[in-house]
């Protein structure tokens, strides 16, 4: 009996405790050529990729044929469709007005040859640079829709392995910070300088790098997607959905398993991010499930352009995700974060409920070229350009967290900032937190707690350090 995708999501949401059984859900969901019930019906203004020479046999590289169908559809604002099968492809570029439909029984599978992903100007981890295109690109286009109940599979393990191999070389040399940029890996989907774009109902597997990257874009909707990046390993940097210096973005009903940040706001890194100075703003994230990730909802670490007017609600976060709500940055990032509202969050066995760490991961955050290295790419210089301290320390203010329940946590709060720029005007209301320890708050001003129940098993209250006007604890 086939399992319908929406029914699966409803069933998973209704039974959150049974997490171990969900780790292999993608295997049972994975359509193959033999599972396709029939060919997609040909409708007016549709473009069947097999009419352009695509094979869908899992081995033939179908990039040119699929791109030809996309280009033809762009002339009439048409729809690209697939018969059931496994289509191996390199980078595809969707065009204005195109609907790209990957139906049930179709798997679009990424090539494992990095040469099949052409280099192009983009932004990667906060730096503008040349980098391989994503598997699916909406690059300076508008009015594009990705839809269907099928699978887009990055087939990314070869890229995960190449990253870990490079880390083994770089870490002993003190250049761990460079590995993420030097190891070129394709994202699964990127919207770059795009407008009025929608992705819905798809299952996204095994991204080689970030899964959905929304960069310099506006009016973007991500709806009812399943992300499963931990199949066959745990891929590094396999963020779920990254919203990067973009505005008017809605993310709704995403169900995510990954090995980095699940839902993440970004806005540029250090000197380059401060130069671009483009915020992420007017973002709504709601009704999402985080099953396994580095953090549930993350702001940073690329904070240089700032974040404002971000509303997150209806989020469920489960073990083994280590942090539910995370603000992370560094003293070279800068940027202003304000107007953040986080509500209606449930966490089960998540070790840390909320963390603010503005000196996050120094080996990655602070780029310094060792004296013995003379030959290096230009972006190393960009990464290592000094940032004056007065510009480098980020400012966080006006954060409202309410209606949060956490059970089985180790620590409720791990919150700290710099004395030069303390955290300001945080409000916490209607929290019910069951944790081993209450935790600590440092360098905070004007924090208020109302209707907060904190059941700390060690019997201690929150440790306040270098803070003033903290009320209600």
Which positions does each model-derived feature cover?
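Extracellular/periplasmic carbohydrate-active domains that bind, remodel
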Residues: 2-473
